[in-house]
Design a protein with these regions (language model features):
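A glycine- and Lys/Arg-enriched "phosphate-lid" helix/loop adjacent to the NTP-binding pocket
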Residues: 107-173
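Hydrophobic anchor at the beta1->P-loop junction of P-loop NTPases
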Residues: 14
Length: 217
């Protein structure tokens, strides 16, 4: 067991497109934290607070009215602001770890690469909404869109899940570009079976924990 009792709160995010297995592998990640006796809190985006969950419903509910891309972006950051100030930042400040299903990387991938909105808009909103808050490590579950679509074919799809494959191809490329520029983002091959994907997730988080245990040495 690595010695992490005196560590400050940490922020871990898990990213991935539809069908990548985020929920399953967040459970794997959390089991690794449990094994180290780490106090953590799991949350998600959009959402994480009562108000932010209402915004999530607005964002994901299928509707006939055209959803303007900038409206979508602003709603996402409105939900994120509530989440950051009421949940994420306070918990990290008190020393608790936060594990979040998606964060701002998703906005760059979906609204930036997928929707084609200017990245400068996202940069500005990110600074306004979260300041210097950034994840300490991000696990990106990479999966070809056609594989993801097949995995979720039997469930009722939300508004975003109903997008065309070209949209999800752009989202995937956006994530891969982010990973190429950010060493905190670890790419996990989510096309493998559950056991092998879980093994990758455990290896990545255990490596991260070992790196923290040596920070003060």
């Amino acid at each position: 067991m690595v010695q992490l009792a005196d560590q400050p709160g940490r922020f871990i995010t898990v990213e991935g497109s539809e069908g990548a297995g985020k929920s399953t592998n967040i459970s794997v990640l959390c089991a690794a934290l449990d094994a180290e006796g780490i106090d953590y809190y799991c949350t998600r985006e959009p959402g994480g607070t009562a108000f932010a969950e209402e915004i999530r419903e607005l964002l994901l509910k299928p509707r006939e009215e055209r959803f303007d891309n900038l409206t979508e972006l602003l709603l996402i950051f409105a939900a994120r602001r509530q989440h950051v100030v009421n949940v994420i930042q306070p918990r990290i400040t008190t020393g608790q770890w936060v594990v979040c299903d998606r964060f701002t990387d998703a906005t760059y991938a979906y609204q930036g690469s997928g929707r084609g909105l200017p990245l400068e808009w996202i940069d500005t909103l990110r600074l306004w909404v979260q300041g210097s808050l950034e994840p300490d490590i991000t696990l990106y579950l990479d999966l070809a869109p056609e594989v993801g679509a097949a995995r979720i074919a039997d469930r009722e799809l939300d508004r975003l899940e109903r997008e065309q494959r070209a949209f999800f191809e752009a989202v995937r490329q956006g994530y891969l570009e982010l990973a190429s520029r950010n060493s905190r983002i670890r790419i996990i091959d989510a096309s493998q079976n559950l056991t092998d994907v879980g093994r990758q997730v455990r290896a990545a988080i255990e490596e991260f924990l070992r790196s923290l245990s040596g920070e003060g040495h």
